[in-house]
Amino acid sequence: MPTIQQLIRHGRSMKASKTASPALEKCPQKRGVCTRVYTTTPKKPNSALRKVARVRLSNKIEVTAYIPGEGHNLQEHSIVLIRGGRVKDLPGVRYHIVRGSLDTSGVADRKQSRSKYGAKVPKAGAAPAKKK
């Protein structure tokens, strides 16, 4: 415990907060180039083939980013936009690829939560989504 005199001389130091997505360098999104697109398996107890991409960002940092939604058109050398946000059951995946921007297409036939997946408004002639 410091004395009052020591506190007058030095004061309390603030604990530095650690960011969850350091590669973004305080930016909301960053652009990058896919160096590898592959699938990986999640931690126990989940089971799936999760689509991920290794991305070299414009600041030369290489990160692993998750590709959300069903189906994608990404391959090596695709230009993508990444945002923060981890995937809980994939260790080391701390970023998401933004669907519907740059080379990434939106999710086809998406009816709900469209803005999160870069899907356009469905045509008026198409059958409406059935409610339960």
Curated annotation (Swiss-Prot):
In-chain residues carrying the UniProt-annotated modification 3-methylthioaspartic acid: 89
Any one of the GO CC terms: small ribosomal subunit
InterPro entries registered for this protein in UniProt: NA-bd_OB-fold, Ribosomal_uS12, Ribosomal_uS12_bac
GO terms of molecular function: rRNA binding; structural constituent of ribosome; tRNA binding
PROSITE patterns named among the record's database cross-references: RIBOSOMAL_S12
Pfam families in the record: Ribosom_S12_S23 (PF00164)
Superkingdom assignment: Bacteria
Alphabetically ordered keywords of this record: Methylation, Ribonucleoprotein, Ribosomal protein, RNA-binding, rRNA-binding, tRNA-binding
Subunit: Part of the 30S ribosomal subunit. Contacts proteins S8 and S17. May interact with IF1 in the 30S initiation complex.
Name of the protein: Small ribosomal subunit protein uS12
Source species of the chain: Chlorobaculum tepidum (strain ATCC 49652 / DSM 12025 / NBRC 103806 / TLS) (Chlorobium tepidum)
Protein encoded by which gene: rpsL
